[in-house]
Amino acid sequence: MDIKKVTGVYFSPAGSTKTVVETTVDELARLFKAECRYISLNTPSDRAQEYQFAPDELVVFGCPVYAGRLPNKISPDFARCLHGEGTPAVALVTYGGRAYDNALAEMCELLTKNNFKPAAGGAFLCRHVFSDKLAAGRPDAADLSELRMLAQDAALKLRNGGEI
């Protein structure tokens, strides 16, 4: 698969999910020798826009988990504003130490319904948004290294034409 652009799309009210997405996008862009860009969905005005993604673009979508789910008040906005064209995707969820339950599967389902083709996914521990003590310092250097390895595995899979 010939990837021309890698786009990071994130909802990251506390900043950790943005770090996870940026690390992954930067590695994928390096591996594919592709340009990269970032789209924040943090504000209602960000989510009011419609975003269309081409088949030769790779989208890395990241979102935090709340009570084991994608944010229920904002997920409908994601479903409305993100549109693929058979676009490959990497699904990333972040959580603060309790559990991510079915959030990763939920994200893959959302992406698939919007004409994306999930090729890889992962759940990553980040500092809990309500406490500096839960998962303090996460994502750390080891987490960022794991993200780069995930990106390398995803790139290899995409080059070989695979999806989840």
Language-model regions, residue ranges each:
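FMN-binding flavodoxin-like domain, especially the glycine-rich phosphate-binding loop
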Residues: 1-20, 25-44, 49-164
